[in-house]
Amino acid sequence: MDATTGPVHYHKLQLWEPGVESEEEEEEEEEEIAEPLVLSLRRLQNTPRNEVGGLPGAWARLLAGLLLLAVSSSLALRQLHSRDSPRGNLGSVAPPASRHSHRPGVYHHSAIISPAATCSQLGQELLVAGGNVVDAGVGAALCLAVVHPHATGLGATFWGLFYNSSSGNSTALTAGPTQLLAPGLGLPTGLPALHLLHAHFGRLPWPHLLTKPAMLAEKGFEVDAPLANALAIQGTKGLCPLFCHTNGTPLGLGARATNPNLAAVLRSAALASSPDLAGKALLNPLVRDLGLELPSAQPVPSLEPALQLLLPRGVLFTTPGPSAGPELVELLESTLHSRTPSSAPCPPFLQTAETPVSSALATVDSNGSMLLLISSINSSFGSGHLSPSTGVLLSNLEASPAPSAWACPLILRDNLDDTEADMLGMVASGISRGAKAMTCTLLNHLATPQIPQQPQHQRPTESPGICGQGALLQAVVHAEHAHVSSVPSGCCPFQGY
């Protein structure tokens, strides 16, 4: 897809407002009833027997009054019943639950999965505010940079895969080659990568996406289980005072952390009009911290057409090199040519000592648009070097020609000829030999005739894995609904509407 493509705009569904039609019908009925009633009263008043003081006229007036009282009471009761009924409640835009309900993880419009509840909630808020899947994904990634510094951050390297249901094109966000700012310190590219993705495909204003992440950094956020566990394992060396108590012990579950210098960087980046300027909002104060000069040449994230592989059931999209996408395509081609896909159990998504620590998220809408993002700072808390003036932890990724084996997102469109075809998105974080694990999981999906219909109240499938690492996220578009298909057991909260 051409990187100069303009912003994507999705059609907004017209909300059904129950009760409007019923109230109009009732007003017409009231007019029909009222008109003959007035005419009949006039006839009574004009009759010869209806004279003042005459007994027949008095009875006629009494009868007319009782009739008017009965009709008025009937109309009032009907109106009260209409207001109390679901159709008469104009404040509700959703059909009654008894008519149209879904199991957890199925949504009419959009859904988001991320490793942190706060960031999934932020993504949902952006979707409800009129944003698209790119807005929600980029906003959630910026949020994770604040609340999950052990796995991602502005110092991370980002890969992404975006499918545009309006055009049918798929685009990859690719990281430039890893470059070192200093020995053991990777050059940060997170801000320019996310700004680039949003500039081409987002809908909401760029500053809007940074408002809540900056507020979380400034006013504080609760330490969740993944961050608390990482702090307990890592210790506090190089992480104080941001992630330590006053006595030097690491913050635990539920403790409140703040990062005001990171908030200042985010607010500065919100004013940037280009990916380059967004990157300099962090890089300029960072090199001052380290006493370095700005590097003359910097890696530039880019948007490229996704790799494609035609399959018997549709087409596969994934990221190009130096991610693990080309290895995934090669494995699928050789496997499909050598045997029929089977539903044999796949080995667990294992994490080894050499597996880079990473963070993944997925956003999807009911039209079929989908964004998968994965980022890494290599080790837990990256280099462990906390920049004093920016509050950012730099990665310790090494400059190497070897592919990023941890980056292997994929999207499968089931049927090229069907405009409402099912879509499957898969992204995994912190896995060893990601291409092999993803290949096995995809082959099992291809061996299934169709997306299984789960019971009405069954939650999404929970896969084994440590929260945030060795974790597979699956999102599906089926029957014009966004589905959260699979999440790791006990973590990766999802939201939608």
From Swiss-Prot:
Glycans are attached at N164, N169, N367, N378. It is found in: Membrane. Its main location: membrane. One of its GO terms (biological process) is glutathione biosynthetic process. GO terms for cellular component: membrane. This is Glutathione hydrolase 6. The chain crosses the membrane at residues 52-72. GO terms for molecular function: glutathione hydrolase activity; leukotriene C4 gamma-glutamyl transferase activity. Keywords: Acyltransferase, Glutathione biosynthesis, Glycoprotein, Hydrolase, Membrane, Signal-anchor, Transferase, Transmembrane, Transmembrane helix, Zymogen. The gene is Ggt6. Residues 73-497 are extracellular. Heterodimer composed of the light and heavy chains. The active site is located in the light chain. Gene3D superfamilies: 3.60.20.40.
